[in-house]
Design a protein with these regions (language model features):
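Membrane-interface alpha helices of multi-pass inner-membrane proteins
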Residues: 149-150, 186-202, 206-213
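Short acidic/glycine- and proline-prone juxtamembrane loop motifs at membrane-interface regions
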Residues: 154-161
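Start-transfer (signal-anchor) and selected internal transmembrane alpha helices
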Residues: 1-42, 133, 224-232
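Short hydrophobic alpha-helices at membrane interfaces in multi-pass membrane enzymes
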Residues: 171, 176-196, 224
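Membrane-lumen/periplasm interface segments of specific transmembrane helices
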Residues: 203, 207-258
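Interfacial juxtamembrane loops and adjacent helix segments
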Residues: 51, 55-108
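Transmembrane and membrane-interface helices of multi-pass
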Residues: 139-147
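Transmembrane-helix motifs of polytopic, lipid-linked glycan transferases
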Residues: 11, 111-136, 167
Length: 258
């Protein structure tokens, strides 16, 4: 086969690998927004798991109280509704403001915050699918799981936790598949993402260890050592927030059942 035909075929395959994830990510984003919006506007509020507790934490953050202070008068953490009514909750008090950023940026009632959360979470996952390359189907399979999808349709910490975790994994997979060695700018990108990863639910911070899959991408010893920086950033970010909220004890007998 002539050499120029071989080159054209490789170029075609490369373009195909890039176009397929793009189509999948777009279809996922549109489908998630449409189906999620239908559920938000016509679904039942009481079907949202712990929706009241997450909403109470959002109201608390909107009032400017980043670190909850314990009320001696009530046995739980409290926040005041817009009508002055006291709302008690405790199992979401330790959550970082980062996991509620859609509701903090797009202020409004529960439904508006639900739409904002859905759009932001679906967008993060769509980007993850787009950049994951040949691993796009794996990201998509996780994204369409009922646990993942239904956690995106109301203001919850799970929405950003799941979507951002998938985005972080996709970035690592993208760097793993790219031609050429790692550069310092890639380490900086991973460090920035790791700082944010440290602010999601503590159980997902372990995902930062995926960066060690990039060790074969470089022969430079300094670059190999620098891959530990994202891990350090993630666990430092997590530790600083946990230190600020270490006084909050969420015991089983004090967890909201709403």
């Amino acid at each position: 086969m002539p050499q120029h035909y071989s080159g054209e075929r490789r170029q075609y395959r490369r373009e195909l690998r890039l176009s397929v994830p793009s189509c999948i990510s777009l279809l996922y984003w549109i489908g998630s927004i449409v189906i999620g919006s239908v559920i938000i506007f016509w679904g039942k509020y009481h079907c949202f798991n712990d929706g009241a507790a997450h909403w109470a934490r959002i109201l608390q953050l909107r009032s400017g109280e980043i670190i909850p202070s314990f009320s001696k008068e009530y046995p739980e953490w409290i926040v005041y509704s817009e009508h002055g009514k006291i709302i008690t909750f405790n199992n979401t008090a330790v959550n970082s403001p980062f996991v509620y950023f859609p509701s903090l940026i797009f202020r409004g009632d529960f439904r508006i915050s639900s739409i904002a959360t859905l759009i932001c979470a679906a967008s993060l996952i769509a980007v993850a699918i787009r950049i994951a390359g040949c691993y796009a189907n794996i990201i998509l399979a996780i994204a369409v799981l009922p646990t993942t999808f239904f956690g995106m349709i109301f203001p919850t910490a799970d929405a950003i936790t799941n979507s951002f975790s998938l985005l972080f994994i996709a970035v690592v997979l993208c760097l793993y598949q790219r031609d050429g060695a790692l550069h310092f700018r890639h380490i900086v990108l991973l460090c920035v993402l790791s700082i944010m990863l440290g602010q999601v639910k503590i159980t997902c911070s372990i995902i930062v260890l995926f960066v060690f899959f990039l060790l074969p991408k470089t022969t430079d010893k300094k670059m190999k050592v620098s891959l530990s920086l994202p891990v350090l950033c993630a666990f430092t970010s997590m530790w600083l927030w946990r230190m600020k909220t270490s006084h909050i004890a969420v015991a089983p007998n004090r967890v909201s059942l709403q």
